[in-house]
Structures are given as structure tokens and as C-alpha cells.
């Protein structure tokens, strides 16, 4: 491994506990040097939350750190090994262009990974160049910060630097490196890698590390690995329900993109739904619609079943008993997901208490929205505002009938109409990272070196539930339908 210029570490107290795991789980790998690093965007709010020195990170040494040109004294950068089912097909993977620089502890004691994405080739690059380009890195920055604003667990972006290098794709593009912050980068695919190419002892080491890092309560449970499985099932059910509630379509729900921490990761072909349609797909490579909006909950169950399979040797020494335990845990996913999703949908309609008829009320509204090609976000936004004029869906007889049933439903709870409206405002965003507004910001930044458009969008996305300061510009719909919008795995 080539030696790197070292920054005497007076600013960040980084360590790397992951290297205490079996060696086959990672490869020591320094980032590649880049030609001319320039800090394009820096997340001051995130840096402050993490207790990091903004002065250092924006200095020449800080920019060199973000680019991978210099490493901090005492750190051991690594690329992580993992496998995964990609569109249902199992394969060996690993960090092909991402390098874990180290871990830091925030001011409240939480541990976070610092990873450089686009930092050069690794032993897992599989013929790739290990590089990333500016547009997709800025896109991940925008979407991940938008998700954070929406209250959805997510990896975050600390900075994007341009590299001054050309990167060859279908055309020549500007190179870039993104600094990603995550509670960890342990994936379902990490467990699949050890399950297929490791020993039971190595699997146990990974599971114990994961428990210690994310689920310390497991120290007090009977079988901690059953607890681990159940907690991951719970966190994924909750995460995917949150995606569905805001119309987020991940686009590439492969098992290597399922984090054990329950954070959203990998924003390559993701997008937000405009017109409500469960069959909505944006990813250019998802030809059969495997990861369509309406399929995401059941794909979540499929991915979790793959995770459960990896844990079988730890669930019980008797394989039949272990399988029964795993099946019992996985069988709870559907009810968990439905509980989280229906609770969220009730909140979007200002409903506090639960009634069995609520499910029919919710599904009826979605059916009407689909029929009239209603915008998902703005339908709930306008319901919240009571703005029901001049929109086809609201003037239809079907909606008027539904509306009376909804209003009658609201009378069957103790809370006032004002309290119901407050609940709706907390759960129905006025803005989302609309696909065409994101593209608008990227074009200005990448082609014109104008980051003002991106910054204005980021400012709006910081508080998408703020009804006191709505920006109509970011709520307007694209002139053409969202069906024409396609995303690519650039990140």
C-alpha cells in the first residue's frame, strides 16, 4: 500500500474498530491522489452536529483530507468486502470505489463512519476505475440531505470536492469525491459475504461487533442473535414505511444496499414520485419493475429473509430449529410494516386513534388519486391546507364522497380539528426533492459552476414541513409527466 502524506491529527479523533474483525472482511487501502482538489460543497450543519472543526475541514489540509490526498495521523483506511443479491442474482461485491477513512464519536457518544466515495480503485473494483463524477455526487448530497429533512434515517453527506480530473463514462465528466457519514456501512451483504466465504467463528465475530455497535441492549436478551434479527426486521419495516409515506423510490434495493443500522444508503437511481402510481419506476436498469414503488415493502421482506439465512448457524445449533426461528421472525415483518405504514397514513389524514375502517378510507383515497393521476405530495399538502379547488381529483364525485367520509371520521376522535391539522402538517411535507428541481440544481452547478440554485434548494429542504414559509416554486409540478424521468446508477 502506497504511503500517503499524513496530517498531524489535532482536529479529529478518529479510530477504526472494524479492523479488529477477521482480515477477510476488509482490505487496507489508501485513497488515490487527485490532481487538483477543490471544495465544492460543505455541510456546516452536519459538521457542527458531529463536533468537527469547521475551520480545519475548510482549510487546505481539510480539503486534501476530503479528496484523499492526505490522511490523518494514526488512521488505517480500508475498503470493505461484502456480497449481495443484485436484482435477485447473488454475486461477490465490496467497496469498488469507496474507502472507509475511520470512525468518529459525536458529542453525544454516537459512532459514525467517515467514508470517501470515488476515492480510487480497491481490490474490489472489478475492473472499474474507482472514480466518481461531480453530478452524481452532488445528487447524493442533495437527496440525502432532503431525506434527513423529511425525518427519514439516512446516510449523510459532509462534503463534495471536485478533483480536477476527467472521468470517462459515456462522455468525459468532471471527477469528484463525496464524504459520506453513516452509523456504519455494515450491510445484509456483509453478512452474506461471511456466510458464503467465511467460518461460523467469523460470522459470530461480525454479529458480535454489530450487536456491540448498534444493539447493545442485546446484552440483556436470551439469544442475542435472535434479537439482532428481530431488530433489523423492525428497523427495515419502519424505514421502508417512511419511504412509502413520502413517495420515495430507492431504485436499487439489492441486499448490499440494506444497512443493518436501518439507514437509507446508495442514492444512485432513486427518485421521488410525482403522479401517484404504485408501478412507478425511474431506474433505467429496472426494466421489469422489480423495485417499483409498490413493490418496495415486499422486496424488503425478501431481503430480510436473505439476512435471516446468514444467521442460521447462530440462531440454534439444530438447523431445523434455526429455520423455524428465522421463519417466525420474518413472518412478523408484514404486520410490522403495515402497522408503521397505516399509522403514518392516519397521521397524514389527521387521524389519531385507530379504527378498522381506516384501512378502507386510506385505500379509497389512493385509488382515487391513481385514477386521476394526482400528484402524491401535493394531494396531501392541499388536503392539509384545505385548498381543494381547480384540481381534477378534488372536483370529482368520487373524491367528494370520500371527503365526507373523512370529515365524519375526524369527528370520532377526542382531538379538535386544529389538533388534527397540526398532525397533518407534521406528516405532509410542503416540498420534496422533486426530480426536475434536483436536475435544475445539478445543471447549474456542474455546467455553469453556479451553486446558488443548489443552495436555495437545500435551504428549502431543511424544513419541508414548515407551512409558515412555503415556497410555491418548489411545489409546482413539472410540465411533462414524471414517467419520462429516468435515473442512472451514477453514485
UniProtKB/Swiss-Prot annotation:
Q: Which reaction does it catalyse?
A: L-seryl-[protein] + ATP = 3-O-(5'-adenylyl)-L-seryl-[protein] + diphosphate; L-threonyl-[protein] + ATP = 3-O-(5'-adenylyl)-L-threonyl-[protein] + diphosphate; L-tyrosyl-[protein] + ATP = O-(5'-adenylyl)-L-tyrosyl-[protein] + diphosphate; L-histidyl-[protein] + UTP = N(tele)-(5'-uridylyl)-L-histidyl-[protein] + diphosphate
Q: Which Gene Ontology molecular function entries are recorded, alphabetically?
A: AMPylase activity; ATP binding; magnesium ion binding
EC numbers on record: 2.7.7.-, 2.7.7.108
So which cofactors does this thing need?
Mg(2+); Mn(2+)
InterPro entries per the record? SelO
Keywords in alphabetical order: ATP-binding, Magnesium, Manganese, Metal-binding, Nucleotide-binding, Nucleotidyltransferase, Transferase
Q: Which residues bind ATP?
A: 94, 96-97, 117, 129-130, 180, 187, 266
Q: Enumerate the Pfam families for this protein.
A: SelO
Q: Where is the active site?
A: 256 (proton acceptor)
The EC category is transferase
Annotated positions binding Mg(2+): 257, 266
According to its UniProt entry, what is the function of this protein?
Nucleotidyltransferase involved in the post-translational modification of proteins. It can catalyze the addition of adenosine monophosphate (AMP) or uridine monophosphate (UMP) to a protein, resulting in modifications known as AMPylation and UMPylation.
Name the protein family.
Answer: Belongs to the SELO family.
Mind telling me what this protein is named? Protein nucleotidyltransferase YdiU
**What organism does the UniProt record list as the source?**
Clostridium botulinum (strain Eklund 17B / Type B)
Biological classification of the source? Bacteria, Bacillati, Bacillota, Clostridia, Eubacteriales
Gene name of the encoded protein? ydiU
